Amino acid sequence: MKICLIDETGAGDGALSVLAARWGLEQDEDNLMALVLTTEHLELRKRDEPKLGGIFVDFVGGAMAHRRKFGGGRGEAVAKAVGIKGDYLPDVVDATAGLGRDAFVLASVGCRVRMLERNPVVAALLDDGLARGYADAEIGGWLQERLQLIHASSLTALTDITPRPQVVYLDPMFPHKQKSALVKKEMRVFQSLVGPDLDADGLLAPARQLATKRVVVKRPDYAPPLAEVATPNAVVTKGHRFDIYAGTPE
């Protein structure tokens, strides 16, 4: 995949070459999308819109730390949707990991989560965020046990991932109507990088084959059900719903 690679660390130690080799990236200095190595983290920038700033994964500080400490925990809609109850903490495959926010919420309440991400740039951002998270004194211990990244296409990985999870979670990219600054910023950068999720409908059937208990699909409230398969079971929040489908028992 071609992208502009920039090293702002000043170290000059060939880190970009290592990054490119690991994730199959090719330097393209004219590309509007840039993957930038800063002294703090790896971030994605849209070079023709510098005001958008960089997008990076941070499980330790910022919004994720606030959500972990002051969010709803087990009361969060995503936790309810996957079926967390009492001692039951399902094993989850998040087949559309993105920046890992929902996966992190599930891991923080005790679920083991395997994140699938096919886009090499997004996978590199997730991997960078995980490395910093794993090294953190406060959350590193449980994060290493509960949150892992698999760089693979969901369409192929969903048919051969082992062991089978109890829950498969899907949050395919869908055009956002909301005008919130954060959504606009992230969606603009993300959609410039990965484009629309044209094959998302094809994920539902293999996800239902893989999950032993249920498949949860996050949708904006105005979006039709995935693959046009309606379900009466959903956890509904302001602006979103989590459609729930039966899996395939072992």
Swiss-Prot record:
S-adenosyl-L-methionine binds at residues 101-102, 117-118, 153-154, 171. Its EC number is 2.1.1.242. It is found in: Cytoplasm. It holds the Pfam family SAM_MT. One of its GO terms (molecular function) is rRNA (guanine-N2-)-methyltransferase activity. Gene3D superfamilies: Vaccinia Virus protein VP39 (3.40.50.150), YhiQ-like domain (3.40.1630.10). InterPro entries: 16SrRNA_methylTrfase_J (IPR007536), SAM-dependent_MTases_sf (IPR029063). Keywords: Cytoplasm, Methyltransferase, rRNA processing, S-adenosyl-L-methionine, Transferase. Transmembrane segments: none annotated. One of its GO terms (cellular component) is cytoplasm. Its main location: cytoplasm. It catalyses: guanosine(1516) in 16S rRNA + S-adenosyl-L-methionine = N(2)-methylguanosine(1516) in 16S rRNA + S-adenosyl-L-homocysteine + H(+). Belongs to the methyltransferase superfamily. RsmJ family. Specifically methylates the guanosine in position 1516 of 16S rRNA. This is Ribosomal RNA small subunit methyltransferase J. It comes from Klebsiella pneumoniae (strain 342). The gene is rsmJ.
